[in-house]
Design a protein with these regions (language model features):
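Conserved ABC ATPase signature
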Residues: 52-56, 60
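Conserved catalytic motifs of ABC-family nucleotide-binding domains
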Residues: 73
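Catalytic Walker B motif of ABC-type/P-loop ATPase nucleotide-binding domains
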Residues: 77-81
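H-loop/switch region of ABC-family ATPase nucleotide-binding domains
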Residues: 113-114
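Helical segment within the ABC ATPase nucleotide-binding domain
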Residues: 92-104
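Conserved ABC ATPase "signature" region
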Residues: 33-51
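Conserved beta-strand-loop-alpha-helix hinge in the C-terminal portion
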Residues: 132-159
Length: 205
């Protein structure tokens, strides 16, 4: 069957439960030492394997969550606003890592995001949700969709079209990268990305 890896938006590590990264990664997992070492190197967490989970920075913790999701060699990697709680530098580093994994692994990626700029510049397909599927398709098609324009306005649609045009020239991946843009909260966008509009709609992933 389809193997799915999931990276949540955040994980609150309780300092009263002193679990180390190495132990956390292998909880309910069958990965051996060699597999763990490979994934740790892939996600740049080799140096923090013996650190307690609760002392990690936001970026370190997200890489650990990503590593755990990759241990099972998923066919589909689901990322739920994985960089929302990171600073700009951390976001760039995390998404660069995602692009590297996407390029090197036989994996499809579904990312939920409110970052329209990210969605339009790095995804192959966008699904825009606002209580229902408003529009979907390749980024340049979505930015021209009447419902997208109605949600975000002409100025935002034109700006996003610039990002999608640049993406059309730069993106040469061969497998699926789906971005869901979620409008349920403040606007943003995703890769193979899904865009969900569940809460207040604010033009901004």
């Amino acid at each position: 069957g389809l193997k799915i890896g999931y990276v949540p938006q955040r994980l609150v590590a309780d300092h009263t439960v002193p679990i180390r990264v190495r132990r956390f990664l292998t909880l309910r997992k069958k990965a051996g030492k060699a597999k763990l070492a490979t994934v740790a190197e892939e996600t740049a967490i080799e140096d923090i394997l013996d650190k307690p989970l609760h002392v990690l920075s936001g970026g370190e913790l997200q890489r650990v969550l990503l590593a755990r999701a990759l241990l099972d060699d998923p066919d589909l990697l689901v990322l739920d606003e994985p960089a929302q709680n990171l600073d700009v530098t951390g976001q760039l580093a995390f998404y660069k890592l995602i692009e590297q994994i996407y390029a090197e692994r036989d994996v499809s990626i579904l990312m939920v995001s409110h970052d329209l700029h990210l969605v339009m510049s790095s995804t192959r397909e966008v699904v825009c949700l606002y209580h229902h599927i408003c529009c979907s398709g390749e980024p340049h098609m979505v930015t021209r969709d009447p419902e997208f324009i109605s949600l975000f306005g002409n100025d935002m649609a034109r700006l996003m079209a610039v990002y999608s045009h640049s993406h059309d020239h730069d993106h040469d991946h061969d497998h699926d990268h789906d971005h869901t843009h979620d409008h349920a909260q403040h606007h943003g966008g995703t890769s193979g990305h899904h865009h969900d509009h569940s809460q207040e709609d604010e033009a901004a992933r």
